[in-house]
């Protein structure tokens, strides 16, 4: 009897091709579409252009998934995780922004929704032997590796998964490039073959970000201060709307050199900036991260690199394991390492693990202004 795989179908080209590839590998494929956000239940009105559209993007995605399931002759079911997403992903996102950090919701969406609640339904209700997702990544024996297509590799977003979760997962796109996936879809004439990739917040979609956050956090305007001269150089609409290293959207004109964001003071509602004459305010060479989730059973401590944000080039590091799942990571001068973001550590193509950046240092001094 064929093994049953419950596949997360999003209505996009990646999961559509996954369904076909799993069929070709002899699996019995069951599609499961997740609905994790409700704009009306979640008070998502400001910045949400989808409200006024004739067809909700989420409903269009479901219609596309149904069409592909029909083309491939596989069953497709629908499941709602709206409350779970709010409790485990979105609430965390808002709380992080409130304390001045820059979170990455995709990481916790994977940890709690796609590979936890989704998996529970797949295994208990639909008797799955495995679950599958359209991520560009590779796993073997509970360990996680980068995908073939480095430009699309999503192992960064999966570094909070456990070995037990990974043992029950199939990533059919591990050894394909995005172009190859598109070609397969076009050759099969799948309904999603030319559909553009989704962007925006995981399961929420594209939003006008400043207006979107105002649904949940009141905007608190304040001063923009040059951290080197201590002079007021402008005003901002709320520190939560700016990220470390940001250069655009500051509305600071009339200066000989452009400014970039280097930090903030929440209590004083101050956004700190610097120009290229003072790069040290943007640089760091050490960090402390919390909640380290080790995936690799073994790794070479002399061959480690890391990403501090998605699609960043891997940077050589030195890793020190501390107590209470904390890690200390040292590296050469690097710009815009940001608390709240995830650091993912690699041994070559193998994912060693991931943790959330908590404190950042430069020349043994903690950067207290970020």
Swiss-Prot record:
CDD domains: MnmA_TRMU-like (cd01998). GO terms for molecular function: ATP binding; tRNA binding; tRNA-uridine 2-sulfurtransferase activity. It is an enzyme of class 2 (transferase). It is found in: Cytoplasm. The active site is at 109 (nucleophile), 202 (cysteine persulfide intermediate). InterPro entries: MnmA-like, MnmA-like_C, MnmA-like_central, MnmA-like_central_sf, Rossmann-like_a/b/a_fold. ATP binds at residues 8-15, 34, 134. Residues 104-106 are annotated as: Interaction with target base in tRNA. It catalyses: S-sulfanyl-L-cysteinyl-[protein] + uridine(34) in tRNA + AH2 + ATP = 2-thiouridine(34) in tRNA + L-cysteinyl-[protein] + A + AMP + diphosphate + H(+). This is tRNA-specific 2-thiouridylase MnmA. The gene is mnmA.
């Amino acid at each position: 009897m064929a093994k049953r795989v419950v596949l997360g179908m999003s209505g996009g080209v990646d999961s559509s091709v996954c369904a076909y590839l799993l069929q070709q590998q002899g699996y019995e494929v069951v599609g499961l579409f997740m609905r994790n956000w409700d704009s009306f239940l979640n008070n998502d009105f400001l910045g949400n252009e989808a409200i006024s559209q004739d067809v909700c993007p989420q409903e269009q995605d479901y219609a596309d998934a149904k069409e592909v399931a029909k083309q491939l002759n596989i069953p497709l079911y629908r499941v709602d995780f709206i409350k779970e997403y709010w409790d485990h992903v979105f609430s965390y996102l808002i709380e992080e922004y409130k304390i001045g950090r820059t979170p990455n919701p995709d990481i916790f969406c994977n940890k709690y929704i796609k590979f936890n609640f989704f998996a529970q339904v797949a295994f208990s209700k639909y008797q799955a032997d495995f679950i599958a997702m359209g991520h560009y990544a590779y796993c073997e024996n509970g360990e996680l590796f980068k995908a073939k297509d480095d430009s699309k590799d999503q192992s960064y977003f999966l570094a909070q998964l456990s070995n037990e979760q990974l043992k029950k997962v199939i990533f059919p796109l591990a050894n394909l490039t995005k172009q190859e996936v598109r070609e397969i879809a076009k050759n099969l004439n799948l309904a999603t073959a030319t559909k553009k990739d989704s962007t925006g917040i995981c399961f929420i979609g594209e939003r006008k970000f400043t207006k979107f956050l105002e649904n949940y956090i009141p905007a608190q305007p304040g001063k923009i201060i040059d951290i080197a001269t201590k002079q007021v150089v402008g005003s901002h609409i709320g520190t939560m709307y700016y990220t470390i290293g940001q250069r655009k959207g500051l509305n600071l004109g009339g200066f000989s050199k452009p400014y970039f964001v280097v930090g903030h003071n929440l209590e004083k509602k101050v956004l700190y900036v610097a120009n290229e004459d003072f790069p040290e305010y943007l640089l760091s060479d050490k960090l402390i991260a919390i909640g380290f989730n080790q995936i690799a059973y073994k790794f070479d401590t002399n061959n480690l690199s890391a990403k501090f944000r998605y699609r960043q080039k891997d940077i050589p590091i030195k890793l020190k394991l501390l107590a209470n799942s904390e890690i200390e990571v040292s590296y050469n001068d690097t710009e815009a390492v940001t608390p709240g973001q995830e650091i993912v550590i690699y041994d070559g193509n193998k994912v060693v693990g991931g943790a959330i950046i908590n404190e950042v240092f430069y020349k043994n001094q903690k950067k207290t202004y970020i």
